[in-house]
Amino acid sequence: MVKEISAQDFVKLDKTKITIVDMREETEYSDSHFEGSINIPVSKFWAGIDNIPKEKAVYVFCNSGYFSEEMVILLEERGYDATNVLGGWKEIKKFII
């Protein structure tokens, strides 16, 4: 079972103690993102997976939460402590605006 967190709880986390993987496309990421997050668009997932450090818990989101759930499964299979942010950016932005 994939670990999940609500967008509301995610925005309350201390971002300096976690790794954030933002799977939105580069243009969306450049418009707004969390400082220190890693942008790995869905289209470049396999090329970017090796850039994710394992030292901290990893929180992953895409635009809606679908692709990030798939990425969390793959990261867990590779030994990461990974969590999917439910609802993705569409939900997150409700709590940061």
Model segments located where?
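Rhodanese-like catalytic fold shared by cysteine-dependent sulfurtransferases
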Residues: M1-T19, E26-A57, Y66-I97
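Short, surface-exposed ligand- or partner-binding patches at beta-edge/loop junctions that are enriched
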Residues: F61-C62
